[in-house]
Amino acid sequence: MKISSGAINFSTIPNQVKKLITSIREHTKNGLASKITSVKNTHASLNEKLKTGKSSSIEFALPQKIKDFFQPKDKNTLNKTLITVKNIKDTNNAGKKNISAEDVSKMNAAFMRKHIANQTCDYNYRMTGAAPLPGGVSVSANNRPTVSEGRTPPVSPSLSLQATSSPSSPADWAKKLTDAVLRQKAGETLTAADRDFSNADFRNITFSKILPPSFMERDGDIIKGFNFSNSKFTYSDISHLHFDECRFTYSTLSDVVCSNTKFSNSDMNEVFLQYSITTQQQPSFIDTTLKNTLIRHKANLSGVILNEPDNSSPPSVSGGGNFIRLGDIWLQMPLLWTENAVDGFLNHEHNNGKSILMTIDSLPDKYSQEKVQAMEDLVKSLRGGRLTEACIRPVESSLVSVLAHPPYTQSALIREWLGPVQERFFAHQCQTYNDVPLPTPDTYYQQRILPVLLDSFDRNSAAMTTHSGLFNQVILHCMTGVDCTDGTRQKAAALYEQYLAHPAVSPHIHNGLFGNYDGSPDWTTRAADNFLLLSSQDSDTAMMLSTDTLLTMLNPTPDTAWDNFYLLRAGENVSTAQISPVELFRHDFPVFLAAFNQQATQRRFGELIDIILSTEEHGELNQQFIAATNQKHSTVKLIDDASVSRLATIFAPLLPEGKLSPAHYQHILSAYHLTDATPQKQAETLFCLSTAFARYSSSAIFGTEHDSPPALRGYAEALMQKAWELSPAIFPSSEQFTDWSDRFHGLHGAFTCTSVVADSMQRHARKYFPSVLSSILPLAWA
């Protein structure tokens, strides 16, 4: 029996080892069994030994040189193996075949052949410095593969030492992988050969169809320690899988769907990684190398390990390509900066947070030098593309969101190119958001855009007063944004101190009302009136309000109060009682106008006015009633005889015997889409309408302290009566209902103040059915 030398590199073995190998060959040729001396023999059959659980030890005398050739740990293995070989003699058990001395010899020779080959291979790498296996893999003293040190993780399973027949199709490869993965999941320790899927073909395989769901779950099962080098994954779907300590060197992952795929502690060097555009969630790379791997411009590289780049040429792709280096990774660039290329490569605000800017910036800060170098190469490419301002305009925000932050601000090249871009971005922000609310700032906006706007206001301090609507919003979001840094808040507070010192602002803050009442803002509480907006038309007019009020007026709810602020003229507080909020916002503070109008359109009280006072018959009166809803107090009063008579003529047909006529009641239900509503829902709406007409009759609108239009009081009371008939449960009590009814008419000695009745009813509605009240009551009265 011969020992094959095919796996042994004899050119690197010292002469004494060569002699040992020659000696071993001679022993084998002459019959190694002749060197085996039986010291102990137990004449028992194999079956009897298995039954009794006993074994008869047999010691074999091998040449000491052969024993010394093995590693200490393998000597133990050798001894254990040898002493379990049994020299079974014939015990006259019928049908039992004995193991002959020749079989024993063959068994020992096979064992030795395997270990000699392994030990010699191991010796090659430990003693002679032979080149490591491809991909940086070498064999250590314990026969385990390692990867070169530095910033490269300890991964990459060793190559298989014995050839096996390969599957012939992607389906067969998938079946083989499924079998191996399930065995590993069951706790079986797989050999290197079991985990060797080099040169595999997984094209068009959807892994979720061949693996259990547990492999696709978050924190689920892991595919660990497999060798996928030189494999094809084209058009496959490996989404939601976790590959740990795997090797993908020289593999092709073209058009692979890898949504939320995780690669950890893996070797992905020299990989063609152009994953499919249908990938919804970016794959992640944790402690993984990507040397000379081609990466799409929309990847997340936050966990990648970079090494020094070599002199390799860029990868070749169909149709040609333009590339830049990011450390030792290749990033693909467009051949030409067309409009589509600018949007696709640079506009992460339009592409779900993905762009080449975000890909480069996703690297950890320890790779700042590599990040700056890559961004400079990108800027050079953009500059060489001779892009017009119109072409850059849609991506200005994306550009400044990255390049206007460290470490890129350290680069003179980037600063010089970005300066005009940032100026145009700031001008557009001032033009757009001085008169309308900024979008509700998310984490991205708080961390990337707000600091840029602060920096722009710092460079152009005049804009603080000329665009105080935008400036106050920026400061507001910097001070309240949960994702803003302390540095951002400190800079915002410092800029606001500059703003308050401006001659157009300072006269309004020394009135005992602003901030902490001494002219300084109090940022410890959101209730302090820290914000001061200048009128867009009159520099002598300003609005002072708190953090909470400013937030709610910019992003209102149906319950937002639109009068919870100080209106200042020459620094003095003036009443807003007779000022229409919509006119104030339209003329002086347009930043609130759109939000106010949007809320106003949801108030449907005017529909009842149109039913009672049609524009064809009562155009002037209709306008007076509508105009009164736009302010808290009206200078128009309807208590003169002519007005009282006219109102009585209009409302009398609607109130036969003091109650709503059936026809008018049906008109109300139809106007407010209540025909099929429950009696309670109908009652709540009528109650709120009654509240509004009580306000009409009060001294705040068409009445005075001593008199009010009887028709309006009667109509308000009739609406309330109908609500009581439909659902008494919506009232506080029958006693309260009676009290309100008496006050409308001054019965039983009740004080006839409809202003008190209106306020009381409004408080009750806001507490028990606020959404109904908010859909009806005019904003100025809310």
UniProtKB/Swiss-Prot annotation:
Low complexity composition bias: residue spans: 157-171
Subcellular location: Secreted; Host cell
Reaction it catalyzes: S-ubiquitinyl-[E2 ubiquitin-conjugating enzyme]-L-cysteine + [acceptor protein]-L-lysine = [E2 ubiquitin-conjugating enzyme]-L-cysteine + N(6)-ubiquitinyl-[acceptor protein]-L-lysine
Protein name stated in the entry: E3 ubiquitin-protein ligase SopA
EC assignment: 2.3.2.26
Enzyme class: transferase
Molecular function terms from GO: ubiquitin-protein transferase activity
UniProt function note: Effector proteins function to alter host cell physiology and promote bacterial survival in host tissues. This protein is an E3 ubiquitin ligase that interferes with host's ubiquitination pathway.
Gene (UniProt): sopA
Record carries keyword Transferase: yes
Source organism of this protein record: Salmonella enteritidis PT4 (strain P125109)
GO biological process: protein ubiquitination
Highest taxon above the source species: Bacteria
